[in-house]
Amino acid sequence: MPHYHAKVFVTLKPSILDPQGRTVERALSHLDHTNVSGVRVGKLIELTLTGERPEVEAQLAGITRDVLSNPVMEDARWELEEA
């Protein structure tokens, strides 16, 4: 069976305040990186899955929705490539 490497990217929805991103932005400003704005902090989760691609895609979509993200507050997208 084929193996797939997945990357899941999870970020707060634009309407949700990002205190961690704001802290990073302030720190950058204090370090004279004053041209940086709109910093948002998210998560990258990497997984390896085994199976046929359609089933792996369905499984990954469910894992992303049910376990790796909170759809109320976060947006999530994933990339899948053969390992």
Residues covered by each model-derived region:
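Non-catalytic terminal accessory/regulatory regions of metabolic enzymes
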Residues: M1-A83
